[in-house]
Amino acid sequence: MMKLFVVTSLKEYLGDISKIFNQANIRVFSTVDIIGYKQGTPNNLLDDWFASGEEDVDSMMIFSFTSEEGADHGMELIIGYNKRIKGNFPVRAFVLPVEKSV
């Protein structure tokens, strides 16, 4: 089944994320510049998604329509990558099922 594999990271990690996509056999992907904000809001599910504190962060969203195997391998590689990097900005990733497409 086709999946949508989505990764968000700091712009400086884009080269590493490109290598991860390649290792996961994901050869075609798109990128979008994003700026993540976190303000003093009540607790919610996104509290730990962006940086702590009230700053903005230059980030990238990298995504691809890929096989389930590619998405699963990509997630495993992201988990390993996060264990190796230092800092407060881990790479985030998620997978969504693609039920229909035209």
Give, region by region, the residue ranges found by the protein language model:
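Positively charged, small/polar-rich N-terminal and surface patches that mediate targeting and assembly
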Residues: 1-102
